[in-house]
Amino acid sequence: MADITEVQYIWKNGEMVPWAEATTHVLSHSLHYGSGVFEGIRCYKDPDSDKSFVFRLQDHMERLHRSAKIASIELPYTVEELCAATVEVIRANKLPSCYIRPIVYRGYGVMGVDPSGAPTDVVIACWPWDAYLGPDALAN
């Protein structure tokens, strides 16, 4: 487990918003009924150049789309748009390497088991995160 290091921006519903403004209401449908999907992705800096690479970004976003479909959540962005938004938020935060968390969930507006009418919120956050299992993970 690692603490989250705040960065400047989060991509939310097609816009780059300041970290502190990327909030979700406590009565959002997903918070009460678990109606959401997410991915966990890594971006790595190439040690031999000044370039960074997102690991299997297209595959992750395709899986996010499939997961949303299985959960009956209509995702309002294409795979290509989500990939572009991911690169955009990494660049906006000037992160050479990071953890990326895209999440799709039903937002605030309706309550009850039937999610009809609940808006779909899409967020892509990223932040610095070293080795997932800690600095000694590879050695041990």
Placement of each model-derived feature along the sequence:
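Conserved alpha/beta cores of soluble small-molecule-handling proteins
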Residues: 1-140
